[in-house]
Every structure is written in structure tokens, then in C-alpha cells.
């Protein structure tokens, strides 16, 4: 299983995914996406972000932050802190969910997950051909 970080979910259609792989999304990312809807400053932004969130709701059963994930959080966050790395809360929580499920994390911000790479595989998405920033 691979957990998709929020930044991958935002532009989900821009990336290629392996049909043989299981992909998941964290309830923490859903919270960030919901914040994006609520913080939008125009009706167009609200509509676009709401549509994206509805599409993702239809595609994913959001992984909960359960008791086992909190145990993993203690492990990954303490391990990162012991190396002197700055522990970013949301990223550590998503890394903990990945650790708990034996999953990797796919993100555009690999550096944000480097402190947890000793316990969680960190991947970057492959862009679809013809799509450029």
C-alpha cells in the first residue's frame, strides 16, 4: 500500500499510478483538503476544491488515526527527533499511519518525510505525459 500525501491528492489526475498497487489517503489529508475548501476566497475556488474533495471521497476510504497509528507516531517522531531532525506534526502523523500499515508515502515534498525514511519508504509520483507545470 502507498499513502498519497495531500499535495499528490490535490492534483491527483496529473500522475500515473500502478494498477497493481493499492493506494490510500489519510484522514489528516482530508482535513487539510476540507480546510482548503473553507479557506477559499472565491466561489470558483470553493466549487473547484469541493468537486476535487467529492471525487476523492468517492475514490478513497480515508485511513483513520487509530490507536495503533498513535503508537507508530511515538516511534517515528521519537526516531526523527533523536537524529536532530525537525519533526513536522502532520507529516509525522501520516508517516505513522504508513508505518502502522506497512505502507509507503508518495509525496512531492520528499524532504518533509526524510526524517522518517528509516521506517517508511518515501516515493515521488510519476507525471502523466503532456502535463507540465
Task: List each model region and its residues.
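Residue-level signal for well-ordered alpha-helical positions
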Residues: 15-16, 36-40, 76, 83, ...
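Structured helix-beta-strand junction loops
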Residues: 19, 56-59, 83, 101, ...
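Conserved beta-strand scaffold positions in the cores of enzyme catalytic domains, especially
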Residues: 22-23, 62, 122
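Active-site neighborhoods of divalent-metal-dependent phosphate/nucleic-acid chemistry enzymes
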Residues: 61-108
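Short, hinge-like loop/turn segments at secondary-structure boundaries
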Residues: 40-44, 80-81, 122-125
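Short, well-structured N-terminal submotif of metal-dependent ribonuclease cores
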Residues: 1-54, 131-133
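Residues at the C-termini of beta-strands that transition into short coil/loop
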Residues: 7, 27-29, 66, 109, ...
